[in-house]
Amino acid sequence: MLKKLILPFFLIFTTISAQETDISYYVQKATESYQNKDYAESAKNFRRSLELAPQSQAIKYNLACAYSLSGNNNEALKLLNELVDAGGGLDAEQDPDFTSLKDTPGFNSIREKIKKLKAPVVNSTKAFVINEKDLIPEGIAYDTKTGSFFLSSLYKSKILQVSPDGSFKNFTSERQDGLWAVVGMKADPEWGFLYAASSFTNTMKGSDPKDEGRAGVFKFDISSGRLVKKYTTPAEKHFFNDLVYTKQGDIYVTDSQSPAVYFISKDTDSLKLYLDLAGFQYPNGIALSDDGKYLFVAHSAGILKVDLKKKTYTSVIADNNVSLEFCDGLYFYKNSLIGIQNSNFNRIARFYLDNSLSRVTKMEVLEANNPEFIIPTTGTIKGDEFYFIATSQLRAFDSNGKILPEEKLKDVLILKLKL
């Protein structure tokens, strides 16, 4: 069974355009061939996709499926071994696409590896609980000045403020100031602002189709909760996902639907395209190096290092047994990147970088397969601790995009890890 390449549930009703030079173009062609049971042609197009995104676990998995179904068992086993050695491919045991492999010694060896990978790694403790089950949070931010945390709501299009004692209140009301689904956030204590990325989704409460494709960055005064300014896009194809700010007060935000990074300069106070990332699928998490020279942008197949002065980018390099793909949240900490990988993995990983910040020298799994997890999404660093959303419940909607009944939902759990 093909592994979806991979959009959050709240974007499954939208389409992302694909061109012949894009990974998504070949994935689409491969998927069509798979559905038509032309598995050799499917393998051909997945191979082309993998050439464009050699670290993509999802593409490797799909190619292994196509190989198995077209009778190329040796290549299928080779790819599955690469996947599990990098911590992926956990669905292979139950996947009917690998029926032809399941009695082979090679597949039995893979089963043993998967069993070990599925073991929980739990180093976290409970930070606080929000008993608002239908919040469906995606972003979390911490303000060092007030000691408050902020949680964004995808479903209710609002922001919660959590006091140091764990009590919480609405920082904004639902749809206040024209908010759509609220996604990534950052609190800037120097300027006293909370920046929130907000985008239309079909699953947000009271969604209006006329807003489809709209997105923006909303800047709030932390002390008063007042909207200072919002920077919005026209109704095209945008999904602002996560953002980061510099010491100078500039803001960079990822656009996941029309792959790009946008920029709000403190000097011009306006939203502009900074970097076109056509050819990369679903830019998401974003982080800034401590010296302010480099951005790190996560996408579906890895992480880009962006030189802010030169406005150029390169892919962060990792060995084959280290996967950098699908980091929902991404954070720079002491010459390393912390990524929450919730698509092909169920983990929080720390990627240690070399002095040039270009290559991963070591990976450490901080947390994985925690029984409490219901799609962990993003986090925030407080001192030497990492706080993160453990129960986002991003898929708590039916096939029509309607939220599930409250009795099927869980309280929002925030966990913390010592770094």
Language model features with spans:
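Short loop/turn segments that connect beta-strands within beta-propeller blades
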Residues: V162-S167, D221-R226, S265-D269, D307-K311, ...
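Beta-rich, blade/repeat-based domains predominating
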Residues: E132-T146, L154, Q176-W191, A197-N202, ...
